Regions:
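Short capping segments at the starts of secondary-structure elements
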Residues: 52-56
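Charged, amphipathic alpha-helical coiled-coil/dimerization segments
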Residues: 26, 76-143
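Pre-recognition alpha-helix immediately N-terminal to the DNA-recognition helix
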Residues: 13, 17, 24, 28, ...
Length: 158
């Protein structure tokens, strides 16, 4: 027997639609940044580091609201790819701070341009007011559901 409480319409599910939209954005962004030698896995960390260099892994984890192990793997790949260097903190040699290489700094403009192009294309069907409302709603949901880090948040100053 069919139970209406168990029905699920993926086309009316915020979670399903957000996930689907995120995959579409990621696919389009990936196509634009791979030629730069970047990936969608490293792009969020670069966005933070382009704003504030010299962060610790822990600060990046908090800023991006991701798992420590995921961040460790991402930083290892970024170091391998010549995007970052890790240097001991001057005050506490046990702490490693993350710095961008000249190569990574030089990729900021083309990578951000690629992301803006993807955003503009994706949000093209919406009016300016709808875009603003959409971004505002997503930001509010993230703030209400997340850990407090998210869009617009910056790691604590050192």
């Amino acid at each position: 027997m069919f139970d209406a409480r168990m029905s699920f319409d993926k086309n009316r599910s915020a979670g399903y639609l957000v996930n689907h939209m995120a995959r579409l954005f990621a696919r389009e962004l990936q196509a634009r940044i791979v030629p730069l030698g970047l990936s969608t896995g490293t792009f969020p960390a670069l966005l933070i580091l382009w704003e504030t260099e010299g962060l610790t892994q822990r600060e990046l984890v908090a800023a991006l609201d991701i798992e420590q192990a995921t961040m460790a793997n991402t930083l290892t790949r970024m170091e391998r790819d010549g995007l970052i260097v890790r240097k001991a903190d001057a005050a506490d040699g046990r702490v490693q701070r993350i710095w961008l290489t000249p190569r990574a700094r030089g990729l900021r403009e083309p990578a951000v341009t690629a992301a803006n192009t993807v955003n503009e294309a994706a949000l093209g069907p919406l009016s300016t007011a709808e875009r603003d409302a959409f971004i505002d709603m997503m930001t509010r949901i993230i703030a209400a559901r997340g850990t407090g880090s998210g869009p617009g948040d910056k790691p604590e100053s050192r």
